[in-house]
Amino acid sequence: MPKLAVVLLVLLILPLSYFDAAGGQAVQWDRRGNGLARYLQRGDRDVRECQVDTPGSSWGKCCMTRMCGTMCCSRSVCTCVYHWRRGHGCSCPG
C-alpha cells in the first residue's frame, strides 16, 4: 500500500476530536452525543470549576483556571486585562 494511502487511512481512523490550546481543553461534538459533557465526566474533573465559553452548545472550551476572552489563563490567580491594540490577555502575579 502506498505511503499516502496509509497516511490517509490513519487520519480517517484517528480523528482529532480533542486538542489542548493555551492551557485549556477544546472539545467538539461527536456522533455519540455532547463531547463537552463527556469530557467533564472523565476522571476527577469538577464541572463546577469549569468555565465554558459557549454555554448551551455541544462545542466549547473548558477552563479549569480563569477564562479571559476565548482563552484559559495559566493559573487561577491570574486576572484578565485589556492591552491596547493587542486585545485581552492574562496578567499573572510573580
From Swiss-Prot:
Subcellular compartments: Secreted
Domain comment in the entry: The cysteine framework is XX (C-CC-C-CC-C-C-C-C).
Disulphide bond pairs: C63-C72, C68-C80, C73-C90, C78-C92
Assembly, per entry: Hetero-, homo- or pseudo-homodimer (identical sequence, different post-translational modifications).
Family listed: Belongs to the conotoxin D superfamily.
Main localization of the protein described in the UniProt heading: secreted
Reported tissue expression: Expressed by the venom duct.
Known role: Alpha-conotoxins act on postsynaptic membranes, they bind to the nicotinic acetylcholine receptors (nAChR) and thus inhibit them. Through its two C-terminal domains, this homodimeric protein would bind to two nAChR allosteric sites, located outside the nAChR C-loop of the principal binding face and at the adjacent binding interface in a clockwise direction. This toxin specifically blocks mammalian neuronal nAChR of the alpha-7/CHRNA7, alpha-3-beta-2/CHRNA3-CHRNB2 and alpha-4-beta-2/CHRNA4-CHRNB2 subtypes.
Signal peptide: 1-24
Annotated GO CC locations: extracellular region; host cell postsynaptic membrane
Species name: Conus capitaneus
Designated name of the protein: Alpha-conotoxin-like Cp20.2
Single Gene Ontology MF annotation: ion channel regulator activity
Keywords: Acetylcholine receptor inhibiting toxin, Disulfide bond, Ion channel impairing toxin, Neurotoxin, Postsynaptic neurotoxin, Secreted, Signal, Toxin
Upper classification of the organism: Eukaryota, Metazoa, Spiralia, Lophotrochozoa, Mollusca
Residue ranges annotated as propeptide in the record: 25-45
Top-rank taxon: Eukaryota
